[in-house]
A protein has these predicted regions:
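Conserved anion/nucleotide-ligand pocket segment
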Residues: 148-211, 215
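Glycine-rich adenosine-cofactor-binding loop
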Residues: 5-22, 307
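ATP-dependent carboxylate/acyl-activation modules
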Residues: 276-307
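Rossmann-fold NAD(P)-binding glycine/threonine-rich loop
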Residues: 92-94, 98, 111-150
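Beta-loop-alpha module in the N-terminal Rossmann-like domain of NAD(P)-dependent dehydrogenases
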Residues: 72-102, 112-118
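Substrate-binding/catalytic subdomain of NAD(P)-dependent oxidoreductase enzymes
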Residues: 185-280, 285-287
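A short hydrophobic/small-residue beta-strand
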Residues: 106-107
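NAD(P)-binding Rossmann-fold cofactor-contacting core
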Residues: 25-62
C-alpha cells in the first residue's frame, strides 16, 4: 500500500478543519481515483509530516497534542509528496508555485492566490506534469468546478451564485431580526469566526469576486481582470433598504453573476423575489444556479463559511 506524506501550509479555520477531517475520517479515505473519478487506482495511506505556520509558539501552545508538527521551515523535497496550501493571503501563490516546481502535487483552497495568478499556477502545474486541485476554493462543499469545467461557457449561458457564506449569514440575520442593524450583524458574524481577518474582503465583495473569477476561468479558459467584474459590497446597504425589502416581501443577497451571452460579470447585492432560486438560501450556505443551453436551470446548494 502506497503511503503519501502530506504537508499542510496554514492552520487557520480551514486548516484546522482539514486536519480534523484527515485525522477523524482516516478510515473512510481509501485511495486515489483516476481523473474521471470513476475508478480506484491505488489504495493509499497517509501521514501528516508537518504543518508550516508563521507563529510556531502560538500553535504549539494552543494545540499541544500535535506541537511536534508545527514548523516555520519549508520541508525538503525528499520529505513530502503532497502540499495542502490553506493560507488566506496572496503569499499562498508562492507556496503553490514552489511546491509545483519541486515536483509535488498541490491541493489549495486559496481563491485569492489562484485568481491573482491569472492562470500561471495552472500553467506551471502543466509544465511540471503535476496536479493542482482547488475545488474547495469556491462555493464551499458544492463540487461546482467539476461540473463547470467539462461544460464550458458554450453550454452554460448564465451563472448566478451566492459564493460568500459570511455575507449570506449577515443578510439572513438582518431579515430575521428587525432590531439588528447592518453594523450589528457584521459584528455578530465576525464573533462567530465567519469573516476574514480583514472583513472588507467579505463585506466589500472581494472574496466573491475572486471566486467568480475562478468559475469564469473554468468555463472559458481565461481569467477576467478585476476591473472587468462590477463589484458592489453589502457594506453599501442601509438599514432603510433592508426595511423596504422586508415590506415588499423580498430579500437581499450578494449575488455573483456571469452572463456568458453578454459578457457581463458582476458581484452586487440583488433584491430577490420569492420566485428566485437563490431567495431561500439562508445562513452561511452557498448556492449556484446554472442556466444550461440544453438542461435548463440547475441549482446546487451546500455549506459555505467556516471550515
Amino acid at each position: 500500500m502506497k503511503k503519501i506524506r502530506l504537508v499542510l501550509f496554514g492552520f487557520g479555520t480551514v486548516g484546522q478543519a482539514v486536519y480534523e477531517l484527515l485525522t477523524t475520517e482516516r478510515s473512510r479515505i481509501l485511495g486515489v481515483v483516476n481523473q474521471s473519478a470513476d475508478q480506484l487506482q491505488d489504495k493509499v495511506d497517509y501521514d501528516i509530516v508537518s504543518i508550516v505556520v508563521r507563529d510556531v509558539e502560538k500553535y504549539q501552545a494552543e494545540f499541544s497534542y500535535i506541537s511536534h508538527l508545527f514548523t516555520t521551515e519549508w520541508p525538503s523535497e525528499a520529505d513530502y509528496d503532497l502540499a495542502i496550501e490553506l493560507v488566506s493571503s496572496a503569499a499562498g501563490g508562492d507556496i503553490i508555485a514552489q511546491a509545483l516546481e519541486s515536483g509535488k502535487d498541490v491541493v489549495s483552497a486559496n481563491k485569492l492566490a489562484l485568481y491573482q495568478s491569472a492562470g500561471q499556477l495552472e500553467a506551471l502545474a502543466n509544465e511540471h506534469g503535476r496536479i493542482l486541485r482547488y475545488e474547495g476554493a469556491v462555493a464551499g462543499a458544492i463540487p461546482i468546478l467539476q461540473i463547470i469545467s467539462p461544460l464550458g461557457s458554450g453550454e452554460i449561458q448564465l451563472m448566478r451564485g451566492i459564493l460568500n457564506g459570511s455575507t449570506n449569514y449577515i443578510l439572513t440575520r438582518l431579515f430575521e431580526d428587525s432590531e439588528l442593524s447592518v453594523e450589528d450583524a457584521i459584528a455578530e458574524a465576525s464573533k462567530k469566526g465567519y469573516l476574514e481577518a480583514d472583513p472588507t474582503l467579505d463585506v466589500g465583495g472581494f472574496d466573491a469576486l475572486y471566486k467568480l473569477g475562478i468559475l469564469i476561468y473554468m468555463a472559458t479558459g481565461q481569467y477576467p481582470a478585476e476591473s472587468d467584474i462590477e463589484r458592489i459590497g453589502i457594506d453599501t446597504l442601509t438599514d432603510e433598504a433592508i426595511a423596504e425589502a422586508k415590506s415588499a416581501n423580498k430579500t437581499y443577497k450578494l449575488v455573483a453573476e456571469a452572463d456568458f451571452k453578454t459578457g457581463r460579470y458582476r458581484v452586487t447585492p440583488q433584491l430577490l423575489a420569492s420566485t428566485d432560486p437563490l431567495y431561500g438560501v439562508d445562513g452561511s450556505l452557498n448556492a449556484v444556479t446554472l442556466t444550461h443551453q440544453y438542461a435548463g436551470e440547475l441549482t446546487l446548494q451546500g455549506p459555505g463559511a467556516g471550515g
